């Protein structure tokens, strides 16, 4: 049976009996503003290392650091139905996002987002219903990286460069402990070893010329302000593989 948590976030007031051990950070104060209510059924929260967290956060355009962030506790059980509320969101906050953040409130991967500029003066609660999401590390990479920046060449429209498909349901099996078709003796992803993983090599500094296509440009174009965070997230996922 799903467990349901009602979690309210108010910038000036924190009601302890509702928030449990959920962490909150506020980077700026605000007068009365917009309210966003996230509804989601989440799994995989407890699989994250301590440096990352699953959060509902408000961002200003051009700033990769959240103005306000609410972090879900790592003890949240799988298949938990969560209702999470952000209140007092002023006009400087342009998006509300379900995201993977780090300890500095930096956005690493966006899992779902709503454009608050479409609700400039509303007094009604803005509802953000994202359905069921697996937020474990690989699933987050699938949703926030592969689906956004990779499947155009690896899986969509029947195109799979290097015979690699990175669409949902295919990516893990085609990456982990699978030999590269381009470089002999190298795994696409060597579970537990970033240094032996072609994916890590081609996305990190020095990987520009490993293959005929410069994959570092994928990160620089899609993740301008947080390339290093995405690289770290990929490496953390690889190092955590125990297959």
Label every PLM stretch briefly.
Residues 2-8:
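Sec-dependent signal peptide recognition
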Residues 10-42:
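Bacterial Sec-dependent N-terminal signal peptides
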């Amino acid at each position: 049976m799903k467990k349901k948590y009602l979690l309210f976030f108010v910038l000036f007031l924190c009601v302890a009996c509702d928030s449990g051990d959920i962490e909150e950070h506020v980077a700026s104060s605000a007068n009365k503003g917009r309210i966003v209510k996230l509804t989601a059924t989440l799994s995989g929260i407890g699989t994250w290392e301590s440096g990352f967290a699953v959060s509902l956060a408000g961002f200003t355009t051009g700033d990769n650091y959240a103005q306000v962030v609410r972090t879900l506790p790592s003890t949240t059980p799988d298949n938990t139905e969560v209702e999470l509320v952000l209140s007092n969101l002023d006009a400087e906050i342009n998006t509300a996002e379900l995201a993977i953040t780090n300890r500095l409130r930096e956005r690493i991967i966006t899992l779902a987002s709503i454009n608050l500029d479409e609700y400039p003066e509303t007094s009604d609660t803005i509802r953000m219903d994202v359905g069921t999401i697996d937020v474990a590390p690989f699933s987050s990479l699938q949703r926030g990286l592969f689906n956004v920046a990779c499947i155009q060449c690896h899986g969509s429209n029947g195109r799979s460069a290097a015979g690699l498909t990175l669409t949902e349901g295919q990516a893990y099996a085609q990456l982990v402990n699978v030999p590269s078709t381009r470089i002999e003796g190298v795994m696409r992803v060597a579970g537990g070893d970033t240094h032996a993983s072609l994916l890590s090599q081609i996305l990190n500094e020095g990987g520009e010329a490993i293959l005929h296509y410069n994959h570092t440009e994928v990160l620089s174009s899609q993740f301008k302000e947080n390339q290093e965070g995405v690289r770290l997230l990929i490496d953390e996922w690889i190092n955590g593989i125990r297959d």
